[in-house]
UniProtKB/Swiss-Prot annotation:
The keyword Lyase applies. Pyridoxal 5'-phosphate binds at residues 183-184, 227, 305, 334. This is Aromatic-L-amino-acid decarboxylase. The active site is at 227. Keywords: Catecholamine biosynthesis, Decarboxylase, Lyase, Pyridoxal phosphate. The lineage of its organism: Eukaryota, Metazoa, Ecdysozoa, Arthropoda, Hexapoda. It comes from Drosophila melanogaster. Substrate binds at residues 117, 227. The modification N6-(pyridoxal phosphate)lysine is found at residue 337. GO terms for cellular component: cytoplasm. Residues 1-17 have a biased composition (Polar residues). Signal peptide: none annotated. Changing residue 227 to W: Decreased specific activity to L-DOPA and 5-HTP. Decreased ligand binding affinity.
Length: 510
């Protein structure tokens, strides 16, 4: 064996480059702890729990949008990290001084932008435990509980939605679920699995074609209302994606088939289609029962993106919107949007994960273990290697709320949206821009896009509520999303009064 020299990078100088004294490793006292001790941690954690509870229970009183300008934070903190440890009490004081002035309060009942991001006390506590265990569950052996709880939780969740048995690990077939970070990751993972599947199929039919030639012919499909992450998945996957014109904001099977047939006639190879259930712009639902069979007929991988609306499928009255799910190859929704599970927790199911596993399979010796094949190694199901113990918060939320209370949460939000919609149509100045679906209301002032742009600017400028816009077929409108678990009927009345007051101001200034 060749001689391996001992590292000579241990500092021997009395001072570093800045003139500060170096401490020789042999002079460090091993009995002196550099960590926060358990009693101090308990005091710190109890104080933080009190702060969190006070913050959330009184979040309604805070201005939903911060008034700071870019760069506000840097002058509030030192230019460099402290040489000596500070007191945790000082850190707590700086939360209000440094952090809170720049926070947009997503869990305020006055926050109506985007779609909700979930939050609950059980999920917060679960994240504390996950942080304490601090495992990186890329393989079964890296932390068996991390993998096995995820398998079971994905089956629990799939049963709550009444997904076909082929998607569930408990069915004994190929299928199973995995927790991804976001719906964007799920869309990309599905695309890469579909790409690998189609490459294999085409190579068997045309062994004379090289991979570059085949990839240049692949084309995928989505509605013109699909999320921007679908287009991004195509860019990252190095394939063409074609936008299919929607009908009343929804993709129809006939339009998808026409696009496929046109591309086949031009020598392209269709391989993948994303069907959106609950679009970001207006919460519209593609016709899965039409598009799925079309995709199956042409041997496309059908991926269903139900990032927001999927949570509602735990309620029987909304499951008709996922009619045709048996035709899908993969299905995704985000419990971290609407099911009271803190970010990040994006649930994805695959009928045949082997296409994804084989596409991502890089198997160095240091990641191998004796139990390979007996349980999933989730590193093969995702883009990154590392993964947190995310199943804990799903387990805590499902147990501590129960299905009935989660259903009640969804239904409350849907009723609040109807309440706001009723207030809107009762004012002759306003109109709905789309059908009210789930917890989203799309509305606008009658008249020009410019009037509505001015209205939104005025609403957000007042800072009492926060909305974002959307545009479909050159019609600009405002989106009122019900986002907070603290929302009450009175909050919807307050938000409507803010919208109405902003419109009043515009009229007075004309």
């Amino acid at each position: 064996m060749s001689h391996i020299p001992i590292s000579n990078t241990i500092p021997t100088k009395q001072t570093d480059g800045n003139g500060k004294a170096n401490i020789s490793p042999d002079k460090l006292d091993p009995k002196v702890s550099i960590d926060m001790e358990a009693p101090e941690f308990k005091d710190f954690a109890k104080t933080m729990v009190d702060f969190i509870a006070e913050y959330l229970e009184n979040i309604r009183e805070r201005r939903v949008l911060p008034e700071v300008k870019p760069g506000y934070l840097k002058p509030l903190i030192p230019d460099a990290a402290p040489e000596k440890p500070e007191k945790w009490q000082d850190v707590m004081q700086d939360i209000e001084r440094v952090i809170m002035p720049g926070v947009t309060h997503w869990h305020s009942p006055k926050f109506h932008a985007y779609f909700p991001t979930a939050n609950s006390y059980p999920a917060i506590v679960a994240d504390m435990l996950s942080g304490a265990i601090a495992c990186i569950g890329f393989t079964w052996i890296a932390s068996p509980a991390c993998t096995e709880l995820e398998v079971v939780m994905m089956d629990w969740l799939g049963k709550m939605l009444e997904l076909p048995a082929e998607f569930l690990a408990c069915s004994g077939g190929k299928g199973g679920g995995v927790i991804q970070g976001t719906a964007s990751e799920s869309t990309l993972v599905a695309l890469l699995g579909a790409k690998a599947k189609k490459l294999k199929e085409v190579k068997e039919l045309h062994p004379e074609w090289d991979e570059h030639t085949i990839l240049g012919k692949l084309v995928g499909y989505c509605s013109d209302q699909a999320h921007s992450s679908v287009e991004r998945a195509g860019l990252l996957g190095g394939v063409k994606l074609r936008s299919v014109q929607s009908e009343n904001h929804r993709m129809r099977g006939a339009a998808l088939e026409k696009a496929i047939e046109q591309d086949v006639a031009e020598g392209l190879i269709p391989f993948y289609a994303v069907v959106t259930l609950g679009t970001t712009n207006s919460c519209a639902f593609d016709y899965l029962d039409e598009c799925g069979p079309v995709g199956n007929k042409h041997n496309l991988w059908i991926h269903v993106d139900a990032a927001y609306a999927g949570s509602a499928f735990i309620c029987p009255e909304y499951r008709h919107l996922m009619k045709g799910i048996e035709s899908a190859d993969s299905f995704n929704f985000n419990p971290h949007k609407w099911m009271l599970v803190n970010f990040d927790c994006s649930a994805m199911w695959l009928k045949d994960p082997s296409w994804v596993v084989n596409a991502f399979n890089v198997d160095p010796l240091y990641l191998k273990h004796d139990m390979q094949g007996s349980a999933p190694d989730y590193r093969h199901w995702q883009i990154p290697l590392g993964r947190r113990f995310r199943a804990l918060k799903l387990w805590f939320v499902l147990r501590l709320y129960g299905v009935e209370n989660l259903q009640a949460h969804i239904r409350r939000h849907c009723n609040f949206a109807k309440q706001f919609g009723d207030l809107c149509v009762a004012d002759s100045r306003f109109e709905l821009a789309a059908e009210i679906n789930m917890g989203l209301v799309c509305f606008r002032l009658k008249g020009s896009n410019e009037r509505n742009e001015a209205l939104l600017k005025r609403i957000n400028g007042r800072g009492h509520i926060h909305l974002v816009p959307a545009k479909i077929k050159d019609v600009y409108f405002l989106r009122m999303a019900i986002c907070s678990r603290f929302t009450q009927s009175e909050d919807m009345e307050y938000s409507w009064k803010e919208v109405s007051a902003a419109a009043d101001e515009m009229e007075q200034e004309q």
